[in-house]
Curated annotation (Swiss-Prot):
Phylogenetic placement of the source organism: Eukaryota, Metazoa, Chordata, Craniata, Vertebrata
PANTHER family: SCP160, VIGILIN
The organism of origin for this protein: Mus musculus
Protein name: Vigilin
Role description: Appears to play a role in cell sterol metabolism. It may function to protect cells from over-accumulation of cholesterol.
Keyword Amino-acid biosynthesis: no
Length: 1268
């Protein structure tokens, strides 16, 4: 590509304006030269000659290709073809195509490759896969496995070659499977089989088989050989630093494995090509034989501790000796006690090697420095700083500190060790001179207090005295604390720690019980009050419990005397709080509350301050009249008197005191104040105030309007008199087990006593503590009579007798079954009488009864009644279809249980029939006769009930009949109700909520027919008693829905209004404000035409709602249109430079003008033909006023603009510019087209004059771009 730039005079001047003044000056001096246009050759230099091109073309492309690495395409595409006979999904009509597509989609999602399928003419399947290389390979494997029919084949190769097919970590096998799109199964190592199974397409199997056989053939060329070589000669074969064996391996391409010195094996293993392996073995054998002949050994003793110096780091010293002298040094294993070192080599070199061994052994030394163990960490320094100074200078010296030992061990080169030892000894001497330590015993329970919160105490001591304090961890339970550092600091720290400890020993902890309700008050707002207490007792720590714990215990800890003082102070505070928490309620008529508060709360504030109480008034919107006063008792009473006096002064409020005995107060108040409240409400809302319970006062105060007070007084005195005459009370005692007998069945006995005497008899409730106490209340004579009767009954009950009766043994079981339930009921009902039946198995009919005489007689009578019931028992069958049984039983059998209790019968339901279909059974012979007669009758009577429908009722005949009627009454009945089909879905309700509600309310089942039936009836099933209610409820619902339908029809009245589309935005208003107002005001929906819908008339506005509302909305719209039609629009020229100022920030200024003059002002958009044209719309008089206003603003703002522009001229003077002449463009001299020579213009079609780049120069084809 080439680009052409045309340099005009304007652009040249613009370029020059950016030059620095110096450049401009030079440009001006040389203007004459610059005026001359450049020559064509200067402006367009010619291309290199042909020869140069040829030379450069002849160069190899290596320069380019060597520098740039090949760029591989990141996305590749491969096409696979699956022949018809190998396709897995051939028949497209049997969901094959769908399954095939589904599989392809799965493969794309899993691999990230893109698949495209197409069918060839031969019905073969072509699959194009695009994506990254690994994704394409995985997708290909999946396609073959899932879309192509699979075949399998086995390849036998030697077992030892299997591991080469698998490769390292199975990588080779995975690669092979991806390449060939097959599944290759290799037998496990413990399986003797040598068969490798390949599964895939025919083509894939062939490829995989070929690859496996290739790997095996490769391994056949390789061989493994083991050579026994004495362990002592291994170093000679390996050579110094394994160089010799490395050279042999490189030259022969054979892998040689020499066992390491630590492994006691002698064989050397060779692996590689047979010929090269033979060469390597021969060379090793030669070295071995040669060394065996020439070498000899000497043994020397070297200290065990010096062996490691002879070996050197990673055995480097041994390799160094071997390299220099050719002698191998054998060191005994570290676990051996031997100190003998053997040197093996040629005799003349052994001397030199021995010298080196001793030099290595003695090159390092071990030394120790005596230093107290407590100084070790000071020698090491913070983060090892002190020690680092020594080790940096002498890196080969190893310094070791042993915990608990008073020495430091140094190890390394002798010279370095000596220097390091001197330095450490100097450090130790210096530390001993200027440091000291002391150990003190403090009970470990105080250690955490010495440390303080987050180590605050101990860190302060450390920093203050420049010492180190070592406190043992809690787990050690040790009392010993060690202080180390400057001698003076150590003594000071010791003194402070002991003082702290002694202070803690004198400390005590005390638990103070304070009700949790006072905790917040004691703490105060933002902890102000508790801060005062802590400032008063700074040495005492006060801990309040967590509010969530609901605990009353406040813990004080500190010096004994201070804790005692703090305890007394807090107890006094709590006593004051308790005293001040007395509370009384004052009922004040609601209309006087504002007078009690006073202007700006002046009255109530004055009462609070003078009485020192807290006064809470009910909220204004509350119905409560009660004012609550809290504080000291005397203060509360004073505040109450003042509030009542205000009320008395304000209105005609009378106050009367009535004397009523204190013992009658509770009975007059009634349960939860119901009785007294009813009198207060009945008498015009008077206030009746009873004295505090336990005060002993008889005075009751009635307060209110005088007429109402008198009425309340009369009622109260009448009620008190009535209570007094009837309030004679006597308490008698009787054992709780007698109570039921005294009450009698269904309360019959006690009712008889009440009716005969007129007294009220109260038995204790289950929760009462005194269960023996029976209270008789009423007039004195009635109470005495009732007492006499009850005491006679109790006396009879206390006379215990023993009696017996005869009961047929066949009835015994009825009394004792269900763990003696019947006997327990008799005992409870008849004063705890004991009934004993003979043991089962004995044929005795004697039953013993023991208890009070009356109880025994009553129990005998009851047992006799039960026996008579049992003897008179009959069984009645009640036929009810089995489908209704569950409904008859009721939830958890509640209905049946009720019937059995009411009629004293037993009811048994049949077992559910598994197969309700009647089957004809063959006749069965019984005692030689055919039982065909009965069966024949049964079969011929289709009306007879099924066995599974019959419910059996047992009991007295009349009770069984009554129970049968009750059961039949429980059989559900179905009725049909006419309900229009279109209302069914509304009756059902959302998710069936409507119908479910009706079913629950009326206890029936409502069945709505399926929608496809379009039936107008709804079936109601349930008890006859509930059906009428349910039907009425359903019909009421139908009426409601029909009324809603009618209302919906009325609401859907539509009205269209024709309005010019230009007025639509005005009717809608800013952010829809105007139209929303109309919608809400008239409760209608207003629809504007869709601008994008060409078929819809654009001037029609649709209003939907009630007819009357739509007409009102239409009138409102037409009124707006009428106003808009009266409006005029005028264009006014307004300088664009002042537009922004008139509009203002975020349009505030222009909005203010539009609101003030009730006009609409539109400014031109950027790029408008006339940027000064502003349109003002509104009523004519408003438009005129608005235009005058904005023109005035323009005049004012333009003056500012002109001043600003004039100032800018002086602030930024124009750059030096030459007078601009008409642009000549870019001019050159001696151009080919301007020459007068007779040369004709070049022929563009000629390859000689316009040669193509590199076309003639191709003696040798060289690829363009990087080498492959």
């Amino acid at each position: 590509m080439s680009s052409v730039a045309v340099l005009t005079q304007e652009s040249f001047a613009e370029h020059r304006s950016g030059l620095v003044p110096q450049q401009i000056k030079v440009a001006t001096l040389n203007s004459e030269e610059e005026n001359d246009p450049p020559t064509y050759k200067d402006a367009f230099p010619p291309l290199p000659e042909k020869a140069a091109c040829l030379e450069s073309a002849q160069e190899p492309a290596g320069a380019w290709s060597n520098k740039i690495r090949p760029i591989k395409a990141s996305v590749i595409t491969q096409v696979f073809h699956v022949p018809l006979e190998e396709r897995k999904y051939k028949d497209m009509n049997q969901f094959g195509e769908g399954e095939q597509a589904k599989i392809c989609l799965e493969i794309m999602q899993r691999t990230g490759a893109h698949l495209e399928l197409s069918l060839a003419k031969d019905q073969g399947l072509s699959i194009m896969v695009s994506g990254k290389l690994d994704a394409v390979m995985k997708a290909r494997k999946d396609i073959v496995a899932r879309l192509q029919t699979q075949a399998s084949a086995t390849v036998p190769i030697p077992k030892e070659h299997h591991r080469f097919v698998i490769g390292k970590n199975g990588e080779k096998l995975q690669d092979l499977e991806l390449k060939t799109a097959t599944k290759i199964q290799i037998p496990r190592p413990d399986d003797p089989s040598n068969q490798i199974k390949i599964t895939g397409t025919k083509e894939g199997i062939e490829k995989a088989r070929h690859e496996v056989l290739l790997i095996s053939a490769e391994q056949d060329k390789r061989a493994v050989e083991r050579l026994e070589v004495e362990k002592a000669f291994h170093p000679f074969i390996a050579g110094p630093y394994n160089r010799l064996v490395g050279e042999i391996m490189q030259e022969t391409g054979t892998r040689i494995n020499i066992p390491p010195p630590s492994v006691n094996r002698t064989e050397i293993v060779f692996t590689g090509e047979k010929e090269q392996l033979a060469q390597a073995v021969a060379r090793i054998k030669k070295i071995y034989e040669e060394k065996k002949k020439k070498t000899t050994t000497i043994a020397v003793e070297v200290k065990k501790s010096q062996h490691k110096y002879v070996i050197g780091p990673k055995g480097n010293s041994l390799q160094e000796i071997l390299e220099r002298t050719g002698v191998s040094v054998e060191i005994p294993p570290s676990d051996s006690i031997s100190e003998t070192v053997i040197l093996r080599g040629e005799p003349e070199k052994l001397g030199q090697a021995l010298t080196e061994v001793y030099a290595k052994a003695n090159s390092f030394t071990v030394s120790s420095v005596s230093a107290p163990s407590w100084l070790h960490r000071f020698i090491i320094g913070k983060k090892g700083q002190n020690l680092a100074k020594i080790t940096q200078q002498m890196p080969k010296v190893h310094i070791e500190f042993t915990e608990g030992e008073d020495k430091i061990t140094l190890e390394g080169p002798t010279e370095d060790v000596n220097v390091a030892q001197e330095q450490i000894e100097g450090m130790v001497k210096d530390l001993i001179n200027r440091m000291d330590y002391v150990e003190i015993n403090i009970d470990h329970k105080f250690h955490r207090h010495l440390i303080g919160k987050s180590g605050a105490n101990i860190n302060r001591i450390k920093d203050q005295y420049k010492v180190s304090v070592r406190i043992p961890p809690d787990s050690e339970k040790s009392n010993l604390i060690r202080i180390e550092g400057d001698p003076q600091g150590v003594q000071q720290a010791k003194r402070e720690l002991l003082e702290l400890a002694s202070r803690m020993e004198n400390e005590r902890t005390k638990d103070l019980i304070i009700e949790q309700r006072f905790h917040r008050t004691i703490i105060g707002q933002k902890g102000e009050r508790i801060r005062e207490i802590r400032d008063k007792f700074p040495e005492v720590i006060i801990n309040f419990p967590d509010p969530a714990q609901k605990s009353d215990i406040v813990q004080l800890r500190g010096p004994k005397n201070e804790v005692e003082k703090c305890t007394k102070y807090m107890q006094k505070m709590v006593a004051d709080l308790v005293e001040n928490s007395y509370s009384i309620s004052v009922p004040i008529f609601k209309q006087f509350h504002k007078n009690i508060i006073g202007k700006g709360g002046a009255n109530i504030k004055k009462i609070r301050e003078e009485s020192n109480t807290k006064i809470d008034l009910p909220a204004e919107n509350s119905n409560s009249e009660t004012i609550i006063i809290t504080g000291k008792r005397a203060n509360c009473e004073a505040a109450r008197s003042r509030i009542l006096s205000i009320q008395k002064d304000l209105a005609n409020i009378a106050e009367v005191e009535v004397s009523i005995p204190a013992k009658l107060h509770n009975s007059l108040i009634g349960t939860k104040g119901r009785l007294i409240r009813s009198i207060m409400e009945e008498c015009g809302g008077v206030h009746i105030h009873f004295p505090v319970e336990g005060s002993g006062s008889d005075t009751v105060v009635i307060r209110g309007p005088s007429s109402d007070v008198e009425k309340a007084k009369k009622q109260l005195l009448h009620l008190a008199e009535e209570k007094q005459t009837k309030s004679f009370t006597v308490d008698i005692r009787a054992k709780p087990e007698y109570h039921k007998f005294l009450i009698g069945k269904g309360g019959g006995k006690i009712r008889k006593v009440r009716d005969s005497t007129g007294a009220r008899i109260i038995f204790p409730a289950a929760e009462d503590k005194d269960q023996d106490l029976i209270t008789i209340i009423g007039k004195e004579d009635a109470v005495r009579e009732a007492q006499k009767e009850l005491e006679a009954l109790i006396q009879n009950l206390e006379n215990v007798v023993e009696d017996y009766m005869l009961v047929d043994p066949k009835h015994h079981r009825h009394f004792v079954i269900r763990r003696g339930q019947v006997l327990r009921e008799i005992a409870e009902e008849y004063g705890g009488v004991m009934v004993s039946f003979p043991r089962s198995g004995t044929q005795s009919d004697k039953v013993t009864l023991k208890g009070a005489k009356d109880c025994v007689e009553a129990a005998k009578k009851r047992i006799q009644e039960i026996i008579e019931d049992l003897e008179a028992q009959v069984t009645v069958e009640c036929a009810i279809p089995q489908k209704f049984h569950r409904s008859v039983m009721g939830p958890k059998g509640s209905r049946i249980q009720q019937i059995t209790r009411d009629y004293n019968v037993q009811i048994k339901f049949p077992d559910r029939e598994e197969n309700p279909v009647h089957s004809v059974e063959p006749s069965i012979q019984e005692n030689g006769d055919e039982a065909g007669e009965g069966r024949e009758a049964k079969e011929t009577d289709p009306g007879s009930p099924r066995r599974c429908d019959i419910i059996i009722i047992s009991g007295r005949k009349e009770k069984c009949e009554a129970a049968k009627e009750a059961l039949e009454a429980l059989v559900p009945v179905t009725i049909e109700v006419e309900v229009p089909f279109d209302l069914h879905r509304y009756i059902i309700g959302q998710k069936g909520s409507g119908i479910r509600k009706m079913m629950d309310e009326f206890e029936v089942n409502i069945h709505v027919p399926a929608p496809e039936l379009q039936s107008d009836t709804i079936a109601i099933t349930g008890l006859a008693a509930n059906l009428d209610r349910a039907k009425a409820g359903l019909l009421d619902r139908v009426k409601e829905l029909q009324a809603e339908q009618e209302d919906r029809a009325l609401r859907s009245f539509k009205l269209s209004v024709t309005v010019d589309p230009k007025y639509h935005p005005k009717i809608i208003g800013r952010k829809g404000a105007v139209i929303t107002q109309i919608r809400l005001e008239h409760e209608v929906n207003i629809q504007f035409p869709d601008k994008d819908d060409g078929n819809q008339p654009q001037d029609q506005i649709t209003i939907t709602g009630y007819e009357k509302n739509t007409e009102a909305a239409r009138d409102a719209i037409l009124k707006i249109v009428g106003e808009l039609e009266q409006m005029v629009s005028e264009d006014v020229p307004l300088d664009h430079r002042v537009h922004a100022r008139i509009i203002g920030a975020r349009g505030k200024a222009i909005r203010k003008i539009m609101d003030e003059f009730k006009v609409d002002i539109r400014f031109p958009q950027s790029g408008a033909p006339d940027p000064n044209c502003v349109t003002v719309t509104g009523l004519p008089e408003n438009v005129e006023e608005a235009i005058d206003h904005i023109l005035n603003l323009e005049e004012e703002y333009l003056a500012d603009v002109v001043d600003s522009e004039a100032l800018q001229v002086y602030m930024k003077p124009p750059a030096h510019e030459e007078s601009r002449a008409p642009s000549k463009g870019f001019v050159v001299r001696d151009a080919p087209w301007t020459s007068n020579s007779s040369e004709k213009a070049p022929d563009m079609s000629s390859s000689e004059e316009f040669p193509s780049f590199g076309a003639q120069v191709a003696p040798k084809t060289l690829p363009w771009g990087p080498k492959r």
